[in-house]
Amino acid sequence: MAIHLYKTSTSSTRNGAVDSQVKSNPRNNLIYGQHHCGKGRNARGIITAGHRGGGHKRLYRKIDFRRNKKDISGRIVTIEYDPNRNAYICLIHYGDGEKRYILHPRGAIIGDTIVSGTEVPISMGNALPLTDMPLGTAIHNIEITLGKGGQLARAAGAVAKLIAKEGKSATLRLPSGEVRLISKNCSATVGQVGNVGANQQSLGRAGSKCWLGKRPVVRGVVMNPVDHPHGGGEGRAPIGRKKPTTPWGYPALGRRSRKRNKYSDRFILRRRK
């Protein structure tokens, strides 16, 4: 969808650039409520994920990441906004009467037909195993574990590429630049996730950020020493260290956070950029 620029009637909308409005009329049997009470805290009430809290109430849409409706074609009926992700979703009416939500593939329009299975065309929105796809295919919603459902390349504009197949494994280049092995029997959806311009949006004001459940971000250098290692000093003082750190004293700006000796290290051929 296109990026919409506001008319500069107020200072808050002068710098705003948001996506054009997509209506949301979810089906009652495909939604359920969520109770957001954590606000970035753990069970002891300590902040473990900063800058979270508040936000508008949301209803969770049940998304079909498994795409296990085999050899039954479905038709795209609506393209809707989902408050729980930056990608749009599609309501699919299948031939047997069932209705499901899927991620909106880029370029898909209302009335298009999709299908899942092993011997289906290599066309946008169709889901099939990696072993049945030709090399160079652009894919998204990729399974890591067979039958568990898609877990990779699900954000707006995300796309991965099938670059090799050898033995029981397929080699993929993920959106992060990581190159890794995945079982050829795992399924994926052909095409790119829609709403490619999601990263070009500018909310323009703090209130819009608040509606998304994101709290203000404060620099550590303006805090007190009890709150951050960078804090304290008289007036505008430097951080007082050779290198910046996190609020808990660990090195910041580039420290690797991935667990050492993780079981999946043997499947990663090249680390992400």
Swiss-Prot record:
Keyword Heme applies: no
CC terms in the record's Gene Ontology section: chloroplast; mitochondrial large ribosomal subunit
Segments for region (Disordered): 1-23, 224-273
Organism domain of life: Eukaryota
GO MF term set: rRNA binding; structural constituent of ribosome; transferase activity
SUPFAM superfamilies: Nucleic acid-binding proteins, Translation proteins SH3-like domain
Matches recorded under Gene3D superfamilies: 2.30.30.30, Nucleic acid-binding proteins, Ribosomal protein L2, domain 3
Transcription among keywords: no
Protein keywords: Chloroplast, Plastid, Ribonucleoprotein, Ribosomal protein
GO BP: mitochondrial translation
Localisation: Plastid, Chloroplast
Location, primary (coarse class): plastid
Compositional bias per record (Basic and acidic residues), positions renumbered to this chain: 262-273
Subunit: Part of the 50S ribosomal subunit.
PANTHER family: LARGE RIBOSOMAL SUBUNIT PROTEIN UL2M (PTHR13691:SF5), RIBOSOMAL PROTEIN L2 (PTHR13691)
Family from the record: Belongs to the universal ribosomal protein uL2 family.
Protein name as it appears in the record: Large ribosomal subunit protein uL2cz/uL2cy
